[in-house]
Amino acid sequence: MKVIGISCPLTLGKHVQITSIHFPLSLGVLLAYLRKNGFEIGLWDYNVEEFTEASFIQRLKTEKPDIIGLAAMTPGIKSAHKLATLIKEHAPQITVIIGGPHVDALPVQSAKEFPKFDIIVYGEAEDTFLELCQRLEKKKALKGCQGIVHRVKGKIVQELPRPLIKDLDKLPYAARDIVNFEN
């Protein structure tokens, strides 16, 4: 199963003055953890990569991910929802999952406000995202998957929060090797 992580920018396709760019570390750790557990991974960082709708749609068709995990802070939540909307219009079979500070603080409200997100991950994401991807791969029900908000027959359901990871040493280093630092 192929999982693509997308680091969402503040705006899509508009020039924003940036003073520095940082590797999306949390997303890199999530993806490395998935790879460690047998998933094929990729990272699209639209904070540094050029974005056009046409190139994004083509990339969806070429790379054919099963799951896309969006990472967004509050200023970029509308950009994230725009990406989710494009995904649902052009590749509706892809499961769109979102995490990050905005949805972490407002998981249920975010599900109501942004209907194109299939699943919201809140709280510490590593074990939640792994379990979620494993359930989706095996076509298992999401009920009981701690740390998510999802829909059941159109109704928004918030599962219980997941306990914090006790041993952070079990997590791998971020998957920096999947990024082209040349550009």
Task: For the regions a language model picked out, list residue spans one by one.
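Short aromatic-enriched loop/helix-cap "lid" or pocket-rim segments at secondary-structure transitions
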Residues: 17-18, 161-162, 171
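Glycine/Thr-rich phosphate-binding loops of Rossmann-like dinucleotide-binding domains
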Residues: 13-14, 78, 130, 181
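Radical SAM [4Fe-4S] cluster-binding motif and immediate context
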Residues: 22, 169-183
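Short polar catalytic/cofactor-binding loops
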Residues: 7-13
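N-terminal hydrophobic or amphipathic helices/low-complexity stretches enriched
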Residues: 1-7
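Glycine- and acidic-residue-enriched helix-capping/strand-helix junction motifs
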Residues: 14-27
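Glycine-rich beta-alpha loop elements in corrinoid/cobalamin-binding modules
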Residues: 2, 26, 33-167
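A short, acidic/glycine-rich surface segment
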Residues: 13-16, 52-54
